[in-house]
Amino acid sequence: GAGKSTLLKILGNIIPIEAGTRELGLNVSVGYFSQQRVDVLDMERSVLDEATDGIESSITEQKARGILGAFLFRGDDVFKKVRVLSGGEKSRLALVKLLLDPPNLLLLDEPTTHLDMPSIDAFIEALKNYTGTILFVSHDVHFIRAIAKTTIQIEAGKVTPYAGDYD
């Protein structure tokens, strides 16, 4: 379509820019999520090990398990291998990884696509506590209404900002 996902990928440095420049503010750390990015998960690790891998800040297992629990990974589920997870579970795990070591700019491309309603609601609650900037592309009206403070319509090469959510 209109280039919404491409814009997020450029901002997240996932794809190169063909012309122009990409400039972010000083000390901006970017986290990017799309349902296609679950391929970055290590399939041989446990859910808990994968969730906490590469986190620079020290995080306790209890805190990690708390966030995993909010995303419906409870009890022994945290010891499952990533390879046995469903597509939706892998998406939830990728989101957990972002939220355990949050960047200050979160780019989300259709983040609710493979999630069921309890997972979407858990994700919304986690994002409500997020203190950075969120830029997302979504067709999920429930998600948009819960998260958006400003809406931008991209259509026919034109960008139109609106104050408020979907309504």
Q: Where do the language-model regions lie?
A:
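ABC ATP-binding cassette signature C-motif
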Residues: 1-167
